[in-house]
């Protein structure tokens, strides 16, 4: 999956971006800053790691060669070099700047290759894109004035001029303010000589809701985030359970593994760069 595509897909679905930002917020909030990394740098690296499956931290060296800080290198524009350990900043096709030696590259494991990481949610990306497509289609459906779509069936004493006038009126009814009435006078018309046959109005509505619900479930399953933590309202007659219990379980199953992944930075640098505060458990009530 191209990195540009992952960047564009970050906000295609509210459930997709919200789940990512929830993880970023919780991991970043648990950081105990050190002299080598600040909160802003760490947050950017965490977000890149979850969105792209890759996080890069470039060392800042002192005159004596020691590491005095780590700065964030955007995963969208960072590439590995041909020589192992070389990393390049490539914001454009004709632009490339070699990063300082010793770049820390955190990558989510992939079963097919080991050069770059792959985000965990990739299996649900098509569902997130379908969710966006359904929303955009529905929005255009209202903006272009074709709310229902119908066939106007006419027989009887309607001459060519009247037929053309009806066509012109129908064309003028499209677009903003399309809810208009139409008067048709057929002196010798019979019952049923003019019929309006709707096209899939109810079916389109049901299909839209079905797509939204199905894709939401796929995205949330890929991110493994409890629905009550994303502000989702339970269906009528159902409940999600205690949000404190859900938060505690989510923290243990998802946030702590992310913290463990970033502790690898310490092994790469050879000193304590990343450390986390002990989580204060919320008291029950």
Name what the model sees in each region:
Residues 1-190:
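Structured, contiguous alpha/beta core segments that scaffold functional sites
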């Amino acid at each position: 999956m191209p990195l540009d595509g992952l960047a564009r897909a970050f906000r295609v679905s509210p459930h997709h971006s919200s789940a990512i930002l929830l993880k970023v917020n919780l991991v970043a909030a648990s950081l105990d800053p050190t002299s080598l990394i600040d909160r802003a740098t760490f947050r950017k690296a965490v977000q890149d790691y979850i969105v792209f499956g890759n996080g890069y931290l470039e060392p800042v060296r002192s005159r004596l060669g020691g590491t005095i800080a780590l700065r964030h290198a955007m995963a969208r524009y960072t590439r590995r070099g041909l020589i192992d350990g070389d990393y390049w900043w490539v914001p454009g096709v004709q632009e490339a700047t070699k990063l300082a030696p010793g770049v820390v590259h955190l990558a989510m494991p992939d079963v097919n290759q080991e050069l770059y990481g792959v985000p965990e949610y990739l299996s649900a990306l098509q569902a997130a894109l379908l969710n966006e497509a359904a929303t955009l289609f529905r929005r255009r459906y209202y903006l272009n004035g074709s709310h229902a779509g119908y066939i106007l069936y006419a027989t009887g004493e309607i001459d060519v001029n009247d037929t053309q006038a009806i066509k012109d009126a129908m064309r003028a009814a499209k677009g903003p303010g399309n809810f208009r009435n139409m008067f048709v006078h057929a002196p010798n018309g019979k019952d049923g000589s003019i019929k309006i046959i709707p096209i899939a109005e109810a079916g389109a509505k049901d299909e839209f809701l079905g797509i939204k619900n199905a894709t939401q479930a796929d995205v949330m399953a890929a991110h493994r985030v409890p629905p009550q933590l994303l502000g989702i309202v339970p269906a009528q007659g159902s409940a999600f359970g205690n949000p404190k219990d859900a938060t505690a379980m989510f923290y243990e199953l998802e946030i702590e593994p992310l913290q463990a992944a970033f502790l690898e930075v310490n092994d790469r640098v050879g000193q304590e760069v990343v450390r986390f505060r002990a989580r204060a458990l919320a008291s029950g009530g």
